[in-house]
Amino acid sequence: MSTIRPVFYVSDGTGITAETIGHSLLTQFSGFNFVTDRMSFIDDADKARDAALRVRAAGERYQVRPVVVNSCVDPQLSMILAESGALMLDVFAPFIEPLERELNAPRHSRVGRAHGMVDFETYHRRINAMNFALSHDDGIALNYDEADVILVAVSRAGKTPTCIYLALHYGIRAANYPLTEEDLESERLPPRLRNYRSKLFGLTIDPERLQQIRQERRANSRYSAAETCRREVATAERMFQMERIPTLSTTNTSIEEISSKVLSTLGLQREMF
């Protein structure tokens, strides 16, 4: 059996929902080479027919049945896509009818509700959070009064991508503080962070993994040396323990999982955008 399987994320909007769900499903299966393709804004019959032709062509090329993860809200478009002969995984279809029965109300099919700019106030909060994360990255700005969370860690432990994810998906004002050699020498919480204990969350990482990451940035330097990585991680972990800062290892943890842990630990209740 061929291990190659074409997978299409098809949507009448951005395709983010279909791709996110599809990716989560595919990670449950090993030993396959999934060839993925996102087809966004398939919002009329002509586009749906063109998409179905592309899916069918992929099946003929790889001699295997394609998979379509479909988030189109119009049932007619889904029917056209199904003519491709692909395995259809509909994101919304299994849930719409039960909800209609439970709520005793018909659905109002609206394209792009999940990731469109429907609520300007929410969108504005999201953009402001992103600007905040970028301006407070790696200790660039030290005014943390408006921060919802401050991630603390040694360099290259995953602070920046986590802050950006929190901003984009939850509208969280996330700052991050890189522990310097001076901070680590004292093994105490840096003075500029002491007034913000309730906002602090520590990230740690396996020293070997940290060395691999740092080698990509600055190979064969003191910064990326194995001993430096071991010392910095061990010292940071002692500091977190002494200062009672909640901590999570990023070594084998996805950004999504890190973000969820940060939110739950600090009691930040936000809906995902």
Swiss-Prot record:
Its EC number is 2.7.11.33, 2.7.4.28. Pfam families: Kinase-PPPase. It comes from the Bacteria. ADP binds at residues 153-160. One of its GO terms (molecular function) is ATP binding. It catalyses: [pyruvate, water dikinase] + ADP = [pyruvate, water dikinase]-phosphate + AMP + H(+); [pyruvate, water dikinase]-phosphate + phosphate + H(+) = [pyruvate, water dikinase] + diphosphate. Keywords: Kinase, Nucleotide-binding, Serine/threonine-protein kinase, Transferase. Belongs to the pyruvate, phosphate/water dikinase regulatory protein family. PSRP subfamily. Bifunctional serine/threonine kinase and phosphorylase involved in the regulation of the phosphoenolpyruvate synthase (PEPS) by catalyzing its phosphorylation/dephosphorylation. PANTHER family: PYRUVATE, PHOSPHATE DIKINASE REGULATORY PROTEIN 1, CHLOROPLASTIC. This is Putative phosphoenolpyruvate synthase regulatory protein. It comes from Xanthomonas campestris pv. campestris (strain B100). The lineage of its organism: Bacteria, Pseudomonadati, Pseudomonadota, Gammaproteobacteria, Lysobacterales.
